[in-house]
Amino acid sequence: MKVTVECALLITLIVEIIIGCLGNGFIAVVNIMDWTKRRRFSLVDQILTALAISRLAFVWSLLTVLVISELHSSLLITRKMLRIINNFWTVTNHFSIWLATCLSIFYFLKIANFSNSIFLSLRWRVKTVVSLTLLVSLLLLLVNVIIINTCIVISVEGYKVNMSYSSHFNNNPQISRIPLFTNTMFTFIPFTVTLTIFLLLIFSLWRHLKKMQHRAKGPRDPSTTAHIKALQMVVTFLFLYTIFFLALVMQAWNNEIQSKTVFNLVFESIALAFPSGHSCVLILGNSKLRQAFLTIIWWLRSSFNAAELSSP
């Protein structure tokens, strides 16, 4: 039974890795090719491209940690390796979440309908708002990395070199929970920002629908459609991020779980659902990416049909 579960989780993990690499790679390639062709790189395309690249790095960071911990767990004993893995995972996770948050901020400022002077000022300076958000996030990243590295140095010094250590620092409670609590604390900030944006978008849509009812217009005007589309994107991000957040919290119980291989596969599968699933949503929600995806599907189908006709 355990072997069957491990095989199922491993297959799920492989599928998620493939989807994550192909989906995020597709987003980056399409936007870069469009930039090369048009010599124009819009703000939303810049955010999407940077997000896709960070997600690719995040997927590979999780895969690297899983492979090293299962095949060469002794490498994770050294302080240097601990710091490298923690720093790489923290940085890729940070940009993956904060760039998605910046995308939500962009949609909110472009679509929401408020007459407040502060909101209107931010709307006219959306690029500045996104840039400042990323700048502030870099300061938070610096603090996060400093805290994690300091705690790792202090914790490792207190233990012998022969301590038992495996995936995601799960055999030593003090060290294993350092990245858990610090990353959970710092990644909760963009989650709160996105949740606030979601609530404001709902309020903006409610006000807009109320205004349209007074004007006796249909509910599906362009502004309503844009609101609903933005809400779908934000809701999907919140849902996938919540799953990822719960996966981080689950790591706190890893020390009490005896079947650590199964648990690690479960954690990796849940964690990879965030960057892999969100890339598919971004492709389907963006008209340019969706059109490019449908073009590739049509080309593959035509090539397959042509190969069948040419075969004897």
UniProtKB/Swiss-Prot annotation:
Q: Which GO terms describe its biological process?
A: detection of chemical stimulus involved in sensory perception of bitter taste
Q: Which residues lie on this side of the membrane: Extracellular?
A: 1-9, 68-87, 155-185, 251-264
* Carbohydrate attachment residues: 162
Tell me, what's a Pfam family for it?
TAS2R
Q: What UniProt keywords apply to this chain's record, in alphabetical order? A: G-protein coupled receptor, Glycoprotein, Membrane, Receptor, Sensory transduction, Taste, Transducer, Transmembrane, Transmembrane helix
Regions of this protein lying in the Cytoplasmic compartment: 31-46, 109-133, 207-229, 286-312
Lineage top rank: taxon: Eukaryota
Which ranges does the record mark as transmembrane? 10-30, 47-67, 88-108, 134-154, 186-206, 230-250, 265-285
Taken from the UniProt entry, a GO cellular component term is: membrane
The way this protein sits in the membrane is described as: Multi-pass membrane protein
Q: Which family does it belong to?
A: Belongs to the G-protein coupled receptor T2R family.
Task: Recite the other comments.
Answer: Several bitter taste receptors are expressed in a single taste receptor cell.
The name of this protein is: Taste receptor type 2 member 140
**Species in which this protein is naturally found:** Rattus norvegicus (Rat)
Q: What is the lineage of its organism?
A: Eukaryota, Metazoa, Chordata, Craniata, Vertebrata
Q: Which gene encodes it?
A: Tas2r140
